[in-house]
Amino acid sequence: MAEVLLFEALRDALDEEMQRDPSVLVMGEDVGHYGGSYKVTKGFHEKYGDLRLLDTPIAENSFTGMAIGAAMTGLRPIVEGMNMGFLLLAFNQIANNAGMLHYTSGGNFKIPIVIRGPGGVGRQLGAEHSQRLESYFQSVPGLQMVACSTPYNGKGLLKSAIRNDNPVIFFEHVLLYNLNENLIEQEYLLCLEKAEVVRPGNDITILTYSRMRHHVLQAAKVLVNKGYDPEIIDILSLKPLDMGTISLSVRKTHKVLIVEECMRTGGIGASLRAAILEDLFDYLDAPIQCLSSQDVPTPYSGPLEELTVIQPNQIIQAVEEMCKIE
């Protein structure tokens, strides 16, 4: 066992897969000589050279298209967005090409590409650099979406994403890179389509992902001391949703609280709520509650920035109110 930070776990995943498979390469702004904006590829340029660590111009649409073309020829490119918000400039490439080329080519082309990088609210990065793109990409056919939340699942999910023959959008939260955890030294992979039951419980199901997993766990400490028994599920796979794991929990607790950093309108929470109501309505004893970020641009001010996202005290209050419903 060794203590590893999240960005180090992601680096280890990339390093192991690049050693294992010479078709794996990384491209993006400052991923080579500089080692990436959050040092996830630090030292890789010296180890793997210019052909497998491609420093690109500031042209997201162009280098994402280049990566998709490389994937069509049999390579396994990993695109790093310096900030996930910048990938809006490559939306056409991701949606119309990465997501659909396998279908529109009649199955002749696989698109084994991973698009990863930092996003979310934090570090006072301002409105343009605090985007949550999961709401944008969830409706694009052909894309898988994963959000890591710990060094353990970050490493295991990224390795699986690289080996996957489908395009995967891999979300990393800017505030979680220095999160530490003891990891086993043996190689492991995690299923891209499986949620994690973080804490078993009987009173209420709390569905969450990414940074909000940790806000929920903070709230859970208080709730347990007050006598509540929440079941916490990190959904991990944003698309497709692991409705099997979610269904088992809802049938047991009969109450659902969704906690996300995504916007309330059109977010992952809205999709989760719709899926649960469609399949599990008869098992619910209370309306589904969804705690989401406000539908406003993220302020630069630190205190105002925090006010736009859900905090642990709001989770505690929501659980207490829902558990009063018989």
Curated annotation (Swiss-Prot):
Function as written in the Swiss-Prot or TrEMBL entry: The pyruvate dehydrogenase complex catalyzes the overall conversion of pyruvate to acetyl-CoA and CO(2). It contains multiple copies of three enzymatic components: pyruvate dehydrogenase (E1), dihydrolipoamide acetyltransferase (E2) and lipoamide dehydrogenase (E3).
UniProt-annotated binding residues for thiamine diphosphate: E60
Protein name: Pyruvate dehydrogenase E1 component subunit beta
Reaction catalyzed: N(6)-[(R)-lipoyl]-L-lysyl-[protein] + pyruvate + H(+) = N(6)-[(R)-S(8)-acetyldihydrolipoyl]-L-lysyl-[protein] + CO2
Alphabetical UniProt keywords: Chloroplast, Metal-binding, Oxidoreductase, Plastid, Potassium, Pyruvate, Thiamine pyrophosphate
Record-listed K(+) binding positions: I113, A161, I162, N166
Domain of life: Eukaryota
